[in-house]
Amino acid sequence: MANQGRKSFSIKPKGSSGCVVVFHEVWGLVEHTEDVCKRLSKLGFASSAPNLYRGHERLLTPGNIQRAMEGVWDLSLEERRDKTKVTQALDRKRASREAREAVSLLYNPAFRDGLLAGALAAVDDVQAEFEGVTTLGFCMGGGLSLKCATKNQKLKSAISFYGEPPPTEDVARISAPILDIHANQDEIINKKVPSWVEAMLDGGKDLTLKTYPRTKHGFFNDTRKEVYDRTAATEAWDITGWFLERTLGRH
């Protein structure tokens, strides 16, 4: 397994004073995450993608996660954190033992707290080395990127692709500019967006919001042909580059 035990994937061009911490999707630190880091280097930025599943890679494989997510796909975010509802959903789908173990871990509150702790630690490590730091995340990682902005006031900015917004009561602690990108066919995540946007605007926060029509959750990931949208992904990356130049600068 390529990422078994690896702490992170990093690209640090010589002379870079700005770095983007990249948080992976629910699939783990896979080739697509590494490709995002390579794209960032072409824009002139250093990058570091922590392996947030370190120590759990044998269970949290993309295959196991795919089967696990299929078992709970019809549940809301809140229902997925209800152990009884998750168990009932997996029973209906006759999920495998590995899928059950994977979903049990992914929605375990202590494990999720550990993901945030790992994300924050990764940001701290990078901030000790680089003058300017931005977070960028996709899916699960997008939510972590936004949560980091509520916890670390030294961030230059934070970027989320279809991530779950943080609780509205945490918005007051955000000081960094936010770029929030969504797919319009993403009902579960999008239910939380209006209250999040309202809280950001009411708080006078720096928010750039973009929702792409006729796209699904994960549209930026070109390794997932069932959801990838080339046009939206290309434009979203152009906006990401513009936002990084505005908030982190070219280094």
Question: For each predicted feature, which ranges?
Answer:
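N-terminal cap/leader regions of alpha/beta-hydrolase-fold enzymes
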Residues: 1-251
